[in-house]
Curated annotation (Swiss-Prot):
Binds to DNA and alters its conformation. May be involved in regulation of gene expression, nucleoid organization and DNA protection. Its main location: cytoplasm. Keywords: Cytoplasm, DNA-binding. It comes from Synechococcus sp. (strain JA-2-3B'a(2-13)) (Cyanobacteria bacterium Yellowstone B-Prime). InterPro entries: YbaB-like_sf, YbaB/EbfC. Belongs to the YbaB/EbfC family. GO terms for cellular component: bacterial nucleoid; cytosol. GO terms for molecular function: DNA binding. Homodimer. SUPFAM superfamilies: YbaB-like. This is Nucleoid-associated protein CYB_2894. It comes from the Bacteria. The keyword Cytoplasm applies. Pfam families: YbaB_DNA_bd (PF02575).
Length: 111
C-alpha cells in the first residue's frame, strides 16, 4: 500500500490495477484468438469451428449429411453455428470474469 500520498496513493494503486487488467486483457485476446471451439449438430455429422472471439474457422460436413434435403443441411449448419457461438461466448465471459473478478479499486467506490 502506498503511504503518505493521501488520495494520490489510492489513485496510483488504482492505475496500477488498471494496467494489470489491461495486460491481462491483451493476453486473453491472444488466447481467445488461438482457441478452437467446435459446435456440432446431427450427432456430429455437421461441425462448425470458431475461435474464442466467435470468428468462424472451419465447417466440416460428413458426406452422409449431403444425402439430406437442403433444408435439413441448412438447419444442421445453423444449429452447429449457434452451438459453437454459444460455447465461445460463454468461454469468453468466464475468462473475462476470471480476469476482472478480483479487481477492486480502493477509494473509488468501484470494488
Amino acid at each position: 500500500m502506498t503511504r503518505g500520498f493521501g488520495p494520490f496513493g489510492k489513485i496510483q494503486e488504482a492505475l496500477k490495477k488498471a494496467q494489470e487488467v489491461r495486460d491481462g486483457a491483451q493476453r486473453l485476446q491472444k488466447e481467445l484468438e488461438e482457441m478452437e471451439i467446435v459446435g456440432e449438430a446431427g450427432n456430429g455429422l455437421v461441425k462448425v469451428t470458431v475461435n474464442g472471439n466467435q470468428e468462424p474457422l472451419k465447417v466440416s460436413l460428413d458426406p452422409q449429411v449431403l444425402q439430406e434435403s437442403v433444408d435439413v443441411v441448412e438447419d444442421l449448419l445453423l444449429t452447429a453455428m449457434v452451438n459453437a457461438y454459444t460455447q465461445s461466448a460463454e468461454t469468453m465471459r468466464k475468462r473475462m470474469e476470471e480476469l476482472t473478478g478480483n479487481i477492486s479499486l480502493p477509494g473509488l467506490g468501484l470494488g
